[in-house]
Amino acid sequence: MYHSYADIPDPWDRLRWCRYGLDLLQKEVAAMVGMEEWLYRDLESGIFHRSFTPELADKLAALYGIPVEDILDDYTLFLHRGGVDFLRRY
């Protein structure tokens, strides 16, 4: 489907690409970063939940050796960067 990581437009496909590159199962990744398997499975399907915390995003990025911005959609990246707190101040 994709020839390189740079060709992948969607965060959820980047997660899958990285996991395949490390030859890991979804349940293995979930256990390594301390999340439920269903949550990781949903992330790879493009479903982001409130329980996908900035800390979990940072752990996944560290595991895969990529910038956290590469695995977050725009809304989740906004939340990760403290966007809600920023808006509350105004």
Give the residues covered by each predicted segment.
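Short, charged recognition helix plus adjacent turn
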Residues: 2, 62, 70-90
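Conserved hydrophobic/aromatic packing and binding residues within compact polymer-binding modules
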Residues: 15, 29-30, 40-43
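Short, basic-rich loop-to-helix N-cap that marks the start of a DNA-contacting helix
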Residues: 23, 47-62
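Short coil turns linking two alpha-helices in DNA-binding domains
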Residues: 25, 36-38, 67
